[in-house]
């Protein structure tokens, strides 16, 4: 059997026979290694006879050494001569003198053992830990029932009275006997019959029991296997014991736990042989049970067993759990070879697809390639010499390194990798020094700066890996952001400043009004300082169009000529179809950061990535050159404080004094006074800021930096030279005493103190936000990871209706934004002219979207992942364009992960705060990151709004309690009580639809699902998530949020199972539900009934089909317990499962359809 080629993995309970079958021998002694010889003790926990030799090809006693004895079993010490790495895979076992229960199945919630036996966990615990007897066979004793619990005293009395006419026992043995007697088929039938008549709590209990019984019945696991007779001992290399420098030993906690089990087991054996009194044996059995519990899951019951220093020992369960557990530490994230890290510095001389790699680092990373080349070229005659040459860094080595590195891309990664642009490929250029050089334009994608950031380098080894790195990951091919499809490689800071400076105009600059015969002449004049860079001049331009030469005079500045030389002249900013525009410069305005973004966006659309990458590098050169030439820098004298400042402040103080007077005379309330004072100071600050900005010269460096978008903002300028204004106290309430000074003048002590509140809050908030945002991303990835584009078209007829998203009157997302890059689900026809704008299943491009909006369409029916029929994924047509490339999405793209990253990456920018709505009674509305979490976890929101369950007219009654009644024409009516302080959203006599809000607040999505069905809740969640991100100015395409919502809504809760295999109350995937029903209908049986449920992302991630993915996410023990009882099979469909078992992920080039391509030579 090929160990790496399998399609599924199954987990189930191990029977005692199975455990003995795995084992190579019984561990009988608690000894580990001999303290004198340091060799493992025979029959101990590290025994070589059981687990294999500690040294390669060498038995314990030393009779057989060397490879030639391979496979020989030594007649003296019984050790097989083989490789020592078998100690990583050979297992042993311990035969227990008395059976013990497995704590996972007894203690988990709900207790599986308790459910199948119909005993309460408390009674079960009493029996298992020898505190009470359980009746196994009541015989003919009156009033005695099977499974009845007897105390010591009751048992003794009955024993005296009836002798051997009944049987009762305690401990795991008694439970094992009870479990053995269970007939699963019969029990299942009985429970199903009871279910038909049961109601309420009883019904729920029966359903729970039935679930466990069915799990055992279908999986072929026997209930008595939950009780252990034999305990497996894991291979010694997985619980190593190593010698420290001081001659002491460090050992894994597991060895301590195993030793306790063996000690107690041996003692119990001895006591039984001696025929010790029952009470002593009972105590020993209890201790054995507790030792095994601690080994499997320490601390689950009672106090954990502690090691030195009162530290709880790590049990087998702890080895799997949490961030440091096997799953997350070693299986999902491994450290890899051929990697290095170093500090990054800026490399402005690089091309966009290059990075500077320090020589010594490159030599170490490419060592095997260099060695191979050295031998190939005959510089060294064997690999050993080549290795030496490389290690001594001989001079020839460097030339070879240059050769090897050519055309071999490397990957650069900066942690935290929040989206896929956190790892990109570059062609390395060897540099001196020990720092990695990074191109300034890719810093945005990495969120990198040069204040000491470090980055990691990885080398793709195989030819396929190199090809993928070059074509898919090269930085020049990743100019767009996958979250919204906008360019992410846009010049920033100095470059923006340089270009802004370059395109400024200055009235009366040197040489203004001169006329030049050509661009070259004008630039020559500028170089010789005859004209200034910003002077308005005239230039003759000559252009060849359709074979004829057009020439004419254009008004411009030398700076704009320089900029337009690097920018293509047909980007569509100027309408060239008009004769008078033929000679105009493409970019004839002041260029700030926004404009640069537009230019690059157009470049990508018109010219594609390769040409754009070249243009970007040229813009970068210009930007740096002219920000240097312009020598733009900040000094204290640049902060000009407006003269009117004192006057404005005096006026404000007078107004505040008047308001205080009104308050003292009792004409206004304290609250009104406070609000008016605050609004006065805010107005004053704004007025001052306006004055300040008007006052600054347009060549003032601070003004240039802010208005070009290079650095800083209006608000910051106002703090430097205006006034700092109002500050908030730690609880978030505004302090009414403003800070009247600015930083140029300096703050006084009280002002400084007030401003520290906000500063500290900001830092604390940022730290909290980073952690919360990371956890949100992790949950999103986990819920969406198995969504991969699996086919071109799923063939569904359905789509969703989209219209603009509004919040009150404000448009949050326009219709155009929502439909670009999607496929139409119906023909879209212009109502006025009757022409078909776009056919069904055709892509809606920007032009088409504009046409649709111009035709006055208010809503459009488009394909969406929410209605996609593809199982385990989505199809190209429902997904639409891949925003990272601007092309239709490829089959194999892991769109689920991309969606999770798109939503999670801006998480750190969202605020944490809860806004207080005005008034005391108004409830807080959650916003920012907590609101996103609340939506994705489908929680009942804080400050829940009352929604109408029917449509009709509203009547509002105000008696002791406010009530709202909704009536419709069919005579239906519903009445809702309005809690004190809630603000109404409707007026008397208004008409409302089902699902409309009656009071302010957030809607509970579960209610919405009940009232308006799946579509209603989907659009609500989408709009609400978009609102939060748009408030922070973050653009995320709808399709990403839709993918997450799709995952939250893919389950059905069974209400009535009909004649199917399903159980009532089960939550199953829609596909499975439909399959079962189709089967039932085909066989003429009654299909099941169910309703769609909305699961929060954590719950949805845990209820996935794959137990490996769920176990590596959260609640590891619970997931595995459940999976083992059900005998679950993991079909290895998602990404995580495959990463865990070390296969290629089934996405991208790892998909089966790509893996099966074979290249054949043509004859």
UniProtKB/Swiss-Prot annotation:
One of its GO terms (cellular component) is DNA-directed RNA polymerase complex. Zn(2+) 2 binds at residues 794, 868, 875, 878. One of its GO terms (molecular function) is zinc ion binding. One of its GO terms (biological process) is DNA-templated transcription. Zn(2+) 1 binds at residues 59, 61, 74, 77. Its EC number is 2.7.7.6. Its cofactor is Mg(2+); Zn(2+). Mg(2+) binds at residues 449, 451, 453. It holds the Pfam family RNA_pol_Rpb1_1. Keywords: DNA-directed RNA polymerase, Magnesium, Metal-binding, Nucleotidyltransferase, Transcription, Transferase, Zinc. The keyword Zinc applies. It is an enzyme of class 2 (transferase). It catalyses: RNA(n) + a ribonucleoside 5'-triphosphate = RNA(n+1) + diphosphate. SMART domains: RPOLA_N. Binds 1 Mg(2+) ion per subunit. Belongs to the RNA polymerase beta' chain family. The RNAP catalytic core consists of 2 alpha, 1 beta, 1 beta' and 1 omega subunit. When a sigma factor is associated with the core the holoenzyme is formed, which can initiate transcription. DNA-dependent RNA polymerase catalyzes the transcription of DNA into RNA using the four ribonucleoside triphosphates as substrates. This is DNA-directed RNA polymerase subunit beta'. It comes from Caldicellulosiruptor saccharolyticus (strain ATCC 43494 / DSM 8903 / Tp8T 6331).
């Amino acid at each position: 059997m090929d160990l790496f080629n399998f399609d599924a993995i199954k987990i189930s309970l191990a029977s005692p026979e199975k455990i003995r079958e795995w084992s190579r021998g019984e561990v009988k002694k608690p000894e580990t290694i001999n303290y004198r010889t340091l060799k493992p003790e025979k029959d101990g926990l590290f025994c070589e006879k059981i687990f294999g030799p500690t040294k390669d090809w060498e038995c314990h006693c030393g009779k057989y050494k060397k490879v030639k004895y391979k496979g020989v079993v030594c007649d003296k010490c019984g050790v097989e001569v083989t490789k020592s790495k078998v100690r990583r895979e050979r297992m042993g076992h311990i035969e227990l003198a008395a059976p013990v229960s497995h704590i996972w199945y007894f203690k988990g919630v709900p207790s599986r053992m308790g459910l199948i036996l119909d005993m309460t966990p408390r009674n079960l615990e009493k029996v298992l830990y020898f505190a009470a007897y359980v009746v196994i066979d009541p015989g003919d004793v009156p009033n005695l029932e099977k499974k009845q619990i007897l105390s010591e005293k009751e048992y003794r009395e009955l024993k005296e009275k009836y002798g051997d006419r009944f049987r009762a026992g305690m401990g795991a043995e008694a439970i094992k006997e009870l479990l053995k007697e269970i007939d699963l088929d019969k029990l299942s039938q009985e429970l199903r019959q009871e279910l038909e008549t049961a109601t309420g709590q009883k019904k729920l209990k029966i359903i729970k029991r039935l679930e466990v019984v069915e799990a055992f019945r279908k999986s072929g696991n026997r209930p008595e296997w939950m009780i252990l007779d034999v305990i497996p001992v894991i291979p010694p290399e997985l619980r190593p014991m190593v010698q420290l420098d001081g001659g002491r030993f460090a050992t894994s906690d597991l060895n301590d736990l195993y030793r306790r089990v063996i000690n107690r087991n041996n003692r119990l054996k001895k006591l039984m042989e001696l025929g010790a009194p029952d009470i002593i044996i009972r105590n020993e059995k209890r201790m054995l049970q507790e030792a095994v519990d601690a080994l499997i899951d320490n601390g689950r019951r009672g106090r954990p067993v502690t090691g030195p220093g009162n530290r709880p020992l790590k049990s087998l369960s702890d080895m799997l759990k949490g961030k440091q557990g096997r799953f997350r530490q070693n299986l999902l994230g491994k450290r890899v070879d051929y990697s290095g890290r170093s500090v990054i510095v800026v490399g402005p001389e690089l091309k966009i697809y290059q990075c500077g790699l320090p020589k010594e680092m490159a030599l170490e990373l490419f060592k095997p390639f260099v060695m191979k080349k050295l031998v190939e070229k005959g510089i060294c005659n064997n690999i050993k010499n080549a290795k030496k040459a490389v290690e001594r860094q001989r001079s020839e080595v460097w030339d070879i390194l240059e050769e090897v590195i050519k055309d071999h891309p490397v990957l650069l990664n900066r942690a935290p990798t929040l989206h896929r642009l956190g790892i990109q490929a570059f062609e390395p250029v060897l540099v001196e020094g020990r720092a990695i050089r990074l191109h300034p334009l890719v810093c945005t994608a990495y969120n990198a700066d040069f204040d000491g950031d470090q980055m990691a380098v990885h080398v793709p080894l195989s030819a396929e890996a190199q090809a993928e790195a070059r074509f898919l990951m090269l930085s020049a091919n990743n100019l767009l952001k996958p979250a919204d499809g906008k360019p992410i490689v846009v010049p920033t800071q100095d470059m923006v400043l340089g270009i802004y400076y370059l395109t400024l105009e200055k009235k009366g600059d040197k040489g203004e009004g001169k006329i030049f015969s050509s661009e070259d002449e004008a630039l020559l004049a500028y170089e010789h300082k005859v004209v200034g860079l910003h002077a308005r001049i005239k230039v003759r331009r000559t252009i060849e169009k359709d074979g004829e030469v057009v020439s004419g005079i254009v008004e411009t500045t030398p700076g704009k000529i320089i900029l337009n030389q690097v920018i293509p002249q047909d980007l569509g900013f100027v309408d060239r179809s008009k004769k008078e525009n033929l000679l105009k410069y493409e970019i004839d305005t002041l260029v700030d950061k926004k404009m640069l973004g537009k230019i690059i966006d157009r470049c990508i659309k018109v010219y594609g990535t390769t040409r754009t990458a070249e243009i970007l590098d040229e813009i970068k050169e210009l930007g740096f050159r002219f920000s240097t030439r312009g020598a733009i820098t900040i000094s204290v004298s640049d902060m000009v404080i407006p003269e009117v400042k004192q006057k404005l402040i005096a006026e404000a103080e007078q107004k505040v004094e008047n308001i205080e007077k009104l308050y003292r005379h009792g004409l206004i309330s304290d609250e009104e006074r406070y609000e008016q004072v605050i609004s006065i100071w805010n107005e004053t600050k704004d007025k001052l800021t306006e004055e300040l900005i008007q006052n600054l010269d347009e060549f003032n460096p601070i003004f240039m930096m802010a208005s070009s978008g290079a650095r800083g903002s209006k608000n910051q300028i106002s703090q430097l030279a205006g006034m700092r204004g109002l500050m908030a106290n730690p609880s978030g309430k505004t302090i009414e005493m403003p800070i009247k000074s600015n930083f140029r003048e300096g703050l006084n002590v009280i002002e400084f103190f007030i401003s520290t509140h906000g500063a500290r809050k900001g830092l604390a908030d940022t730290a909290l936000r980073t952690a919360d945002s990371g956890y949100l991303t992790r949950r999103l990835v986990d819920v969406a990871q198995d969504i991969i584009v699996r086919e071109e078209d799923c063939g569904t007829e359905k789509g969703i209706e989209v219209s603009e998203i509004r919040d009150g009157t404000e448009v949050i997302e326009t219709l155009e934004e929502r439909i670009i890059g999607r496929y139409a689900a119906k023909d879209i026809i212009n109502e006025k002219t009757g022409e078909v704008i776009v056919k069904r299943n055709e892509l809606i491009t920007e032009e088409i979207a504009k046409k649709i909006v111009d035709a006055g369409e208010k809503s459009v029916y488009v394909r969406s992942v929410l209605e996609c029929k593809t199982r385990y994924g989505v199809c190209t047509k429902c997904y639409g364009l891949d925003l990272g490339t601007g092309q239709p999405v490829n089959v194999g793209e892991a769109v689920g992960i991309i969606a999770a990253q798109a939503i999670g990456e801006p998480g750190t920018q969202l605020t944490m705060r809860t806004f207080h709505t005005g008034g005391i009674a108004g409830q807080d509305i959650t916003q920012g990151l907590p609101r996103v979490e609340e939506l994705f976890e489908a929680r009942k929101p804080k400050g829940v709004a009352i929604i109408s369950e029917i449509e009709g007219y509203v009547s509002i009654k105000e008696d002791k309690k406010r009530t709202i009644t909704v009536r419709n024409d069919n005579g239906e009516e519903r009445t809702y009580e309005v809690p004190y302080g809630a603000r109404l959203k409707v007026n008397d006599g208004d008409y409302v639809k089902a699902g409309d809000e009656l009071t302010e607040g957030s809607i509970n999505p579960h209610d919405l699902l009940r009232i308006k069905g799946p579509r209603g809740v989907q659009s609500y969640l989408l709009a609400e998530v978009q609102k939060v991100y748009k408030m922070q100015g973050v653009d995320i395409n709808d399709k990403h949020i839709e993918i997450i919502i799709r995952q939250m809504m893919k389950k059905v809760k069974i209400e009535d199972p009909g004649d199917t295999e399903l159980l009532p109350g089960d939550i199953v995937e829609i596909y499975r539900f439909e399959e079962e029903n189709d089967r039932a209908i085909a066989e003429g049986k009654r299909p099941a009934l169910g309703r769609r449920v909305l699961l929060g992302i954590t719950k949805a991630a845990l209820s996935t089909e794959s137990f490996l993915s769920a176990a590596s996410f959260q609640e590891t023990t619970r997931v595995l317990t459940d999976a083992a009882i059900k005998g679950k099979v993991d079909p290895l469909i998602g990404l995580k499962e495959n990463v865990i078992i070390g296969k290629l992920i089934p996405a991208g080039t790892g998909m089966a359809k790509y893996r099966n391509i074979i290249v054949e030579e043509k004859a």
